[in-house]
């Protein structure tokens, strides 16, 4: 029985290795990177990778489950730490790639005005609606938003009125479709969606630094290293900047 289990484990590992070697490079990236990273991939002079976009928590769980990923770009340090602590990253390949800002958004036709500050009447501004957030317990954008609202003393007002989404782009879509009157997303998400407008910007001191770390996943090939290096060069960084991301190096 033990021998059979050992053989099965070997076959599974060989299957993952074969998937890495035979198919295109697979990149897992935070959903908020979609537009910018798609453009970066088009500019890449090598073999173009396949990029999967989702919440960083979802990606981290899939990597933990053995997904044949070469490069992981998260939207916060926590999920990268999670994988590092469990030995899923190649030592020495982790870098902080980009920064971002957190904003409160509404539909363009909305006349709602709300100054972001301690004790702001956020619940009143929502009326009968809900506040769209990426899941505040485990998705980076939602965690940043919860931290900011707690620091402002208004989380208790709205915690039972959250329209929770699996990632920040899904939260953005709730506002764009008019299903939620307000949402908290990244500045770069607004740049990618004409059907929302910024009501206010959260001061960076209200939440942990919004950082997108990048690392190579254990078992990644040399082509993963080449693409990761391209993400940090001038051409790629200029594309990210054009989409509203901040340079960190």
Where are these regions (language model features)?
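Bacterial N-terminal signal peptides
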Residues: 4-15
């Amino acid at each position: 029985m033990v021998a059979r289990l050992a053989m099965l484990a070997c076959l599974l590992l060989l299957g993952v290795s074969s998937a890495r070697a035979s198919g295109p490079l697979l990149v897992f990236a935070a959903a908020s990177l979609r537009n910018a990273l798609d453009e970066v991939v088009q500019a890449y002079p090598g073999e173009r990778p396949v990029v999967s976009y989702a919440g960083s928590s979802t990606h981290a769980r899939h990597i933990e489950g053995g997904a044949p990923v070469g490069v992981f770009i998260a939207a916060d340090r926590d999920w990268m730490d999670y994988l590092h602590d469990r030995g899923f990253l190649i030592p020495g390949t982790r870098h902080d790639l980009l920064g971002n800002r957190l904003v409160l958004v509404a539909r363009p036709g909305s006349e709602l005005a709300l100054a972001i500050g301690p004790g702001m009447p956020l619940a009143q501004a929502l009326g009968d609606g809900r506040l769209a957030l990426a899941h505040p317990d485990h998705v980076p954008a939602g965690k940043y938003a919860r931290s900011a609202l707690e620091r402002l003393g208004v989380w208790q007002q709205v915690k039972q009125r959250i329209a929770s989404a699996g990632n920040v782009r899904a939260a953005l879509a709730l506002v764009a479709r008019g299903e939620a009157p307000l949402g908290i997303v990244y500045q770069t998400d607004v740049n990618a969606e004409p059907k929302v407008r910024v009501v206010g910007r959260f001061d960076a001191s209200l939440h942990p630094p919004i950082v997108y770390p990048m690392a190579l996943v254990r078992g990644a090939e040399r082509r993963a290293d080449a693409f990761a290096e391209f993400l940090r060069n001038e051409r790629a960084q200029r594309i990210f900047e054009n989409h509203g991301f901040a340079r960190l190096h």
